[in-house]
Amino acid sequence: HASCFAIPTAAVNTYFCYLKQMDDAEGGKGGTLLQEACDMLKTIALQAWTQPLRHDETDENVVSISRFRNHVWWVGGNALAYRSLLPVAAMYRSIPMIDLLAEVCQRGISMTSQTTYSDAFWTEGFTADGAGWGHGKQCLIWGYPIDGTSNALKMLNMLKGSPWAKNLGRDNVQALLNFLRGGAWYYYKGYRLPCLDRGSYVYNPTELSIPYAGMLDNLIGNWMDSFTPEEQRELLQLQQEVKKNRITMETYAP
């Protein structure tokens, strides 16, 4: 985790904290020590894209769609949530990296299932029954699926107004709605049902919002034009019920 998440993030953050000095170093200005520091920060930050090794052909070309598919370390939350991918792409001024991230973010907002496992873009994340997988086919509804999709949406938010702007397609919308609807079945009056993620057996007597509350707010705040008027009404009703920790959605329940 340190080699691909924490240390590269620290390196890229340090780089941008001293951006003027880094620009000088890359422009051939400054002393040898500054240039070496800049090179080292860029080398370490790139580990967000290179580590851990997959021991396949993608290790030779990390800026590839196949790098972000069919491996537990490179899909869902482990792909997009904990790695400083976009900052590193900006650090390297890499158009191919940003091209790739825009595509991965959009295609990652999708569903998988037992029957589509080999063909789905990601082998984990949202599942067709409205639940979710993480670290393979483990039932981790409230962790990796939300983390991966939330950060995909956040990156797409940042790319709005740029040449890399993407709209949510109907497949994206259907995957999101399916998860919002399905996830509500695993939550009751402020409490997550047991056996659904890594922390669901921890005793907590306090009511908490459903874990996808932040993602729902993001959709309503930034992506409402991707939904039909009827879907927008459904999302707004869900948001009101989420705020009360009482999700019934009686108008929409089967």
Regions found by a protein language model. Name each.
Residues 2-20, 26-254:
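Extracellular polysaccharide-recognition and catalytic grooves
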